[in-house]
Amino acid sequence: MRIGATSDLHGVLPAVEECDIFLICGDIMPLNIQLNMPKSRLWLQNTFIPWANGLPCKHVVFIAGNHDFWFERNGGLELDMYNMFHKPTDGKLVYLHNKSWEYEHEIEPGVFKKFKIFGTPYCKQFGNWAFMREPERLEAKYAHMPSDCDILISHDAPRLLGLGEIHERAWAGEDAGNPWLADEIMRKQPKHCFCGHIHSGCHGIQEFNGMKFSNVSLVNEDYVVSYKPLYLNV
């Protein structure tokens, strides 16, 4: 199965290669409307959903991030999310609000392999942004990650392998990764982990203890597109 992954679009909708599943690890909304709920909804309906529905893939699986205030307010309303994203796209768009989704991929005629994807928007606290929680609540949220998770998409970067290390501007050299997310990853051992949030965190694929990791932010710390979506076979 070929997957693509990106994060931190901030309103930029990139060209996407053909793949089976395309993953988006949060911070979808344009910065200039992130606090405006009516404009955010209109942008999702009139711009994001048509773009995602037209991508050359079977499914687009996405989560929210700390700039996605509309999802902080509405993302937990499962029926509303179903009617807004799933129903009008015949199931192509899948929004995960700290939950799992399973996909059966046909690896050869009549033979299917199941993949379990868990997505969480929750981040460690740093300012007054969406989905930021104190450690005890983060631990409770991350505990929902299944022990048989194949693919993890998180907005926050775990404090592992430099995924959350800032490489640009005044904070360069600081590891802003999330230790509570890292702890849960080490407990549950998902096979593939994709994140964003720390725009200049370590991109490319890294391997540790049989797991593969990548920060897939599209933009740099100045919110300028500096990276491309990542593609790999799983």
Q: What would you call each of these model-derived segments?
A:
Residues M1-I3:
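Extreme N-terminal starter segment of soluble prokaryotic enzymes
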Residues A5-S7, F22-D27, H59-N66, Y95-N98, ...:
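Active-site neighborhood of phospho(di)ester-bond hydrolases with catalytic His/Asp-centered motifs
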Residues T6-I107, G177:
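Core catalytic region of metal-dependent phosphoesterases/phosphodiesterases
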Residues H10-G11, M29, H67-F69, Y122-Q125, ...:
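Short, solvent-exposed loop/turn segments at secondary-structure junctions
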Residues M29, Q34-L44, L79, G127, ...:
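Active-site-proximal segments of metal-dependent phosphoesterases and phosphodiesterases across multiple
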Residues E102-K113, W180-H192, H199-V234:
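Binuclear metal-dependent phosphoesterase catalytic core
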Residues F112-I151, W171-P179:
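Binuclear metal-dependent hydrolase catalytic cores centered on His/Asp/Glu-rich metal-binding motifs
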